[in-house]
Curated annotation (Swiss-Prot):
Gene3D superfamilies in the record: Rhodopsin 7-helix transmembrane proteins
Disulphide-bridged cysteine pairs: C148-C230
All ranges on the Cytoplasmic side of the membrane: 101-116, 172-194, 269-290, 344-362
Glycosylation: residue positions: N56
Annotated function: Odorant receptor.
InterPro entries xrefs: GPCR_Rhodpsn (IPR000276), GPCR_Rhodpsn_7TM (IPR017452), Olfact_rcpt (IPR000725)
Family, similarity comment: Belongs to the G-protein coupled receptor 1 family.
Keywords: Cell membrane, Disulfide bond, G-protein coupled receptor, Glycoprotein, Membrane, Olfaction, Receptor, Sensory transduction, Transducer, Transmembrane, Transmembrane helix
Pfam families named among the record's database cross-references: 7tm_4
Localization: Cell membrane
Protein name in UniProt: Olfactory receptor 5AU1
PROSITE patterns according to UniProt: G_PROTEIN_RECEP_F1_1, G_PROTEIN_RECEP_F1_2
Organism: Homo sapiens
Superkingdom of the source species: Eukaryota
Length: 362
């Protein structure tokens, strides 16, 4: 009987609570009514619930990029400089990629790796520089939550892939100088393709872990990134939860990637140096060393800046230093790589002259 009575009263109860939630019921003005209450509108409850859920609401979230400078005149100057360097990066790496692709004389393992390096420089520079150019001229230097996550994923993927590819190029030089008679067997097309695919796989696996770890955190307050693109350390500093576990995980993976690549390079060049010193001819030693000069320069630039940037404690980060180093490995190195590998390489220059002569004759 009681159950039936409650069911019959449910419509009235729902109506009362609906009016309560909308703030439409007010206390009686009658003096006999001594009860008073305060109605909290449903909008306030919803707003409070959104705040309680945490700050990681991806819909509509934006990150404000602090950029390189706040001086408008300097921003316009940097826009011109960055645009010129980015154009040189695109043209230089595109020419190198196409030249190796169309020249039959360059279809060797060494140039296949160099072709992949040009592609990586083209790609990872393109994940950062276009957004930076837009922000130089924009009043609000913002990037969406998903845009920031996408930029970090592809940047980390291409940069880590390049780290492994440079190590593969060191192994290729070891095979060519220390085992010239077995070079075609050691660096067969299958092995070369495996090294390239392995570099990309390792790079994007690391990127998936890197990006997933950082963007699983909650971000609170002002989403101001103290950088000109979405990089790991500045984004981590915005989190409102404990990031120590994430930092340890990222440090382990970054350390493993850099340590494995660095050891491969050091062992390869130790064996190369040992072989060169045993050569009786001074001309032979010079020729062998000259084939490694461009690669050694690329190693010093890329690994020097990367080790400085990512294998430091968080407490030692300096905003000015980090921005300067980031400009070197995102803007300067991709410009220099095709120049270093082409200006000092006779095979590349011959192929370029041959292709250029063929085009002019047509």
């Amino acid at each position: 009987m009681t159950e039936f009575h409650l069911q019959s009263q449910m419509p009235s109860i729902r109506l009362i609570f609906r009016r309560l939630s909308l703030g439409r019921i007010k206390p009686s003005q009658s003096p006999r009514c001594s009860t008073s209450f305060m109605v909290v509108p449903s909008f306030s409850i919803a707003e409070h619930w959104r705040r309680m859920k945490g700050a990681n609401l991806s819909q509509g979230m934006e990150f404000e990029l602090l950029g390189l400078t706040t001086d408008p005149q300097l921003q316009r100057l940097l826009f011109v400089v960055f645009l010129g360097m980015y154009t040189a990066t695109l043209l230089g790496n595109l020419v190198m990629f196409l030249l190796i692709h169309v020249s039959a004389t360059l279809h060797t393992p060494m140039y296949s790796l160099l072709k992949s390096l040009s592609f990586l420089d083209f790609c990872y520079s393109s994940t950062v520089v276009p957004q930076t150019l837009v922000n130089f001229l924009a009043k609000r230097k913002v990037i969406s939550y998903f845009g920031c996550m996408t930029q970090m994923f592809f940047y980390a993927g291409f940069a880590t892939s390049e780290c492994y590819l440079i190590a593969a190029m060191a192994y290729d030089r070891y095979a060519a100088i220390c085992n010239p008679l077995l070079y075609s067997t050691i660096m067969s097309p299958e092995v070369c393709a495996s090294l390239i695919v392995g570099s990309y796989s390792a790079g994007f696996l690391n990127s998936l872990i890197h990006t997933g770890c950082i963007f699983s955190l909650k971000f609170c307050g002002a989403h101001v990134v103290t950088h000109f693109f979405c990089d790991g350390p500045p984004i981590l500093s915005l989190s409102c939860v404990d990031t120590s576990l994430c930092e340890i995980l990222l440090f382990i993976f970054a350390g493993f990637n850099l340590l494995s690549c660095t050891l491969t390079i050091l062992i390869s060049y130790f064996l190369i140096l040992n072989t060169i010193l045993k050569m009786s001819s001074a001309q032979g030693r010079f020729k062998a060393f000259s084939t490694c000069a461009s690669h050694l320069t690329a190693i010093c630039l890329f690994f020097g800046t990367t080790l400085f940037m990512y294998l430091r404690p968080r407490s030692s980060y300096s905003l000015t230093q980090d921005r300067t180093v980031a400009v070197i490995y995102t803007v300067v190195i991709p410009v220099l790589n095709p120049l270093m590998y082409s200006l000092r390489n006779k095979d590349v220059k011959k192929a370029l002259i041959k292709v250029w002569g063929r085009k002019t004759m047509e």
